[in-house]
Amino acid sequence: MIAALLFCCLFAACTPKNDANEALKDMLKIEILKIGKADCSIITDGTTSIVVDCGEEDDGAEISAAMDALGISSIDYLIITHYDKDHIGGAPTLLKKYKVSKLLEPDYTPVDTTAYAYVSYRNALTEAEANGKCGSTEAVSDSVSLTVSDIKLNIVGTFGKDYAKNQDNNDSLVVSLEHLGNSFLFAGDIEKQRITDMLSQGRVQPCDFLKVPHHGVYNSKLEDYFSKVNMKYAVITCSDKNPAEQKTLDLLTAKGCRTFLTSNGTVHIRSTKSGIDITQ
């Protein structure tokens, strides 16, 4: 009788812990860092690690510290959405410290190929490839789909259209991610013309979460874009010095969207079978 009671007590004590461990095993963590008006999203399920953009040059150490805190020792996929300094600046730091299995970058030549951030990025990538620290590099023109465990990635380029003569923000890769029924969209810095093209081409799909394009800068196609995406959550990468535009915030409020600003701190996103949880 005593043995039976002890067994029941042990079973009751262990079951919640096992459930918690199972939930932790299936959890995807996404950190959108507070690094001013710059982009860096770190994504990991504990096995696969993805980094989307790398902030400014001075952000490299902070990005590295955030990755270390998440237990990341190598990068499976490093995705550069476009070649502005607030998206590639920290890449040399990451390419020197971490082994990168695959780097994906946009297939265009920036207006200024002599810009310090771009030259530093190219030099660091060349060195990483020569030293075997970057397994492969792919310039994405059309689209690339990848599936790793419970993570599905789709990376969309411009399908050969070159916007760089006018505004290379529009050459941004747009990254969508699915995990256990939860959907996320990282829209780089796309602006009015690219949004117009993507809407007309049917390349905008609904999702649960949106990293708002171009740091919350308003344009007249955002309302149509937000309506099509129909997200529940949004994050804007901005700073007190360079805040999101009020018109953009008003559109998000009108959509009933729960909006986070990185000027208020790093955004912590957790995706599980139960849904999406976001804290700041």
Predicted region positions:
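Sec-dependent bacterial lipoprotein signal peptides
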Residues: M1-A12
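Non-globular, low-confidence helical/coil segments that flank catalytic cores
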Residues: F11-Q280
